[in-house]
C-alpha cells in the first residue's frame, strides 16, 4: 500500500503546482486558503477526522517502522492518495498546516535506519504537527527530536507552512539536511525555488499597482492611453510556473478588499483562487493530456482558523462544502475518513420557469 501511494506521489511531481494565500477580515477572522494541483491523473483525495488519543504510526523507506505517537489534539485534514498523507488541515486549537511540493531545492538528511523510533515521513509531517502542537514555537522546539525522511528520493521534497490562529505564519524548508524556518508576513506560498527567492523576485514587479495607468504624452499630438481598466497591472505574469503564481497571488491578495466577516472572507478567498485553476491541456502536450480529470486543480481548501471551519471544493464538484470543528467532540469522536466527493459529478440546479 505504501509503495502504491509513493508511486502516485511520484506521478504528482510531474505536475505539481500549489498556491497558498492568507486573508484577514475586519472582525479579526483569519483565513488560510490554497489550491492543490497534483499528478497527471485523478488522485484519491479525502478528509480525515482524527480524535485526541489516536495512535499515529509513521513510515520510513523500509516500512511501517517509524515513530509512533499519540495525538494530543484532534484535527481535520485533507489527504491525497493515502490517509496518513495529510496535505492541509487544522486542529482544534486553530493551528493550521499544509505541505507544498518543493522539487529540486529541498533536501532532507539521509535516512538513518538506526533512528527509526524518531523518524517521520515528510508526507506525515502535517499530521504530526496538527496532532501534537498548538503553537509554532512548540513545533520549532520539537524539530531536534525527529528525523524527517522521504519514502522515495524520486518523489522530491516538500516545504510547509504552519499558521497560528493569531495570523503568525512560518515556512519550513529543509535544505542540505538543515531545517530553516522563515517568518511569512506576506502570507503567500507556492513551490520552488525557495521562499526567500520568491520574496526577492517580487522586486522585479515594483511597477505594478491596482487601477489604470496614467495617460502618457510622448509629444504634442501623440498621447498613449490605457485600453481598459487594470492597465496598472500590465506585465503581471500569467503562466502556471511557481514564480509567476507567487507574483499573481501576492498582488491579488494584497489588493483584495478587507471584508467584514470571516464568512465573507472565505468566499473572497475562493474567488481569488479561481484565478489559479489550471485548465486541463494547458500543462501537457496533446498526446499526454490526462483522461478523466476536469481540472488540474484537484481541490481548493479554505480554512477559517477563528471559527474553526474548513471549507473545500473539488475539480468534479465546485459546490463549497464545510466541516465545522466546533461541532466535533474530539474526545468522543472515532477516527474516520471520507472521500471529498460522494460522487464525482457537478450538481446543477435547474431553474423552473412558470
Regions found by a protein language model. Give the residues of each.
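Aromatic/basic-lined ligand-recognition segments
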Residues: 174-178, 183-186, 194-195
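A contiguous strand-loop segment
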Residues: 17-114, 154, 354
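Structural recognition of the beta-strand scaffold that forms the well-ordered cores
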Residues: 31-33, 96-99, 161-163, 171, ...
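Compact, glycine/acidic-enriched structural inserts
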Residues: 48-66, 104-146, 334-344
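C-terminus-biased signal that marks the final domain/tail of proteins
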Residues: 16-31, 39, 44-45, 142, ...
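Aromatic- and glycine-enriched pocket-lining scaffold segments that form the walls
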Residues: 136, 140-174
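N-terminal signal peptide c-region/cleavage motif recognized by signal peptidases
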Residues: 12-13
Amino acid at each position: 500500500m505504501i509503495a502504491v501511494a509513493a508511486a502516485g506521489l511520484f506521478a504528482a511531481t510531474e505536475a505539481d503546482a500549489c498556491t497558498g494565500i492568507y486573508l484577514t477580515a475586519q472582525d479579526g477572522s483569519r483565513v488560510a486558503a490554497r489550491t492543490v494541483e497534483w499528478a497527471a491523473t485523478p488522485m484519491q483525495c479525502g478528509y480525515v477526522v482524527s480524535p485526541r488519543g489516536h495512535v499515529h504510526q509513521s513510515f520510513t523507506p523500509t516500512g511501517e517502522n517509524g515513530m509512533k505517537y499519540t495525538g494530543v489534539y484532534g484535527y481535520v485534514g485533507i489527504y491525497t492518495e493515502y490517509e496518513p498523507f495529510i496535505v492541509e488541515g487544522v486542529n482544534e486549537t486553530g493551528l493550521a498546516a499544509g505541505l507544498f511540493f518543493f522539487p529540486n531545492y529541498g533536501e532532507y538528511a539521509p535516512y538513518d535506519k538506526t533512528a527509526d523510533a524518531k523518524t517521520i515521513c515528510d508526507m506525515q509531517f502535517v499530521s504530526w504537527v496538527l496532532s501534537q502542537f498548538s503553537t509554532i514555537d512548540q513545533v520549532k522546539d520539537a524539530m531536534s527530536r525527529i528525523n524527517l525522511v522521504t519514502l522515495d528520493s524520486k518523489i522530491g521534497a516538500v516545504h510547509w507552512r504552519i499558521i497560528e490562529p493569531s495570523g503568525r505564519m512560518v515556512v519550513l524548508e529543509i535544505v542540505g539536511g538543515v531545517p530553516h524556518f522563515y517568518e511569512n508576513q506576506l502570507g503567500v506560498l507556492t513551490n520552488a525555488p525557495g521562499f526567500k527567492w520568491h520574496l526577492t523576485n517580487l522586486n522585479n514587479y515594483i511597477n505594478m499597482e491596482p487601477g489604470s495607468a496614467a495617460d502618457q504624452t510622448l509629444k504634442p499630438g501623440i498621447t498613449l492611453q490605457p485600453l481598459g481598466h487594470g492597465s496598472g497591472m500590465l506585465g503581471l505574469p500569467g503562466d502556471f510556473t511557481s514564480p509567476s503564481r507567487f507574483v499573481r497571488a501576492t498582488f491579488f491578495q494584497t489588493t483584495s478588499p478587507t471584508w467584514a466577516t470571516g464568512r465573507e472572507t472565505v468566499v473572497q478567498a475562493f474567488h481569488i483562487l479561481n484565478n489559479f485553476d489550471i485548465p486541463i491541456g494547458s500543462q501537457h502536450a496533446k498526446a499526454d493530456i490526462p483522461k478523466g480529470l476536469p481540472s488540474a486543480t484537484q481541490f481548493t481548501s479554505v480554512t477559517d482558523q477563528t471559527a474553526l471551519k474548513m471549507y473545500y471544493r473539488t475539480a468534479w464538484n465546485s459546490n463549497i462544502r464545510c466541516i465545522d470543528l466546533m461541532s466535533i467532540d474530539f474526545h468522543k469522536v472515532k477516527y474516520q475518513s471520507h472521500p471529498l466527493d460522494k460522487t464525482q459529478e457537478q450538481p446543477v440546479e435547474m431553474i423552473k420557469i412558470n
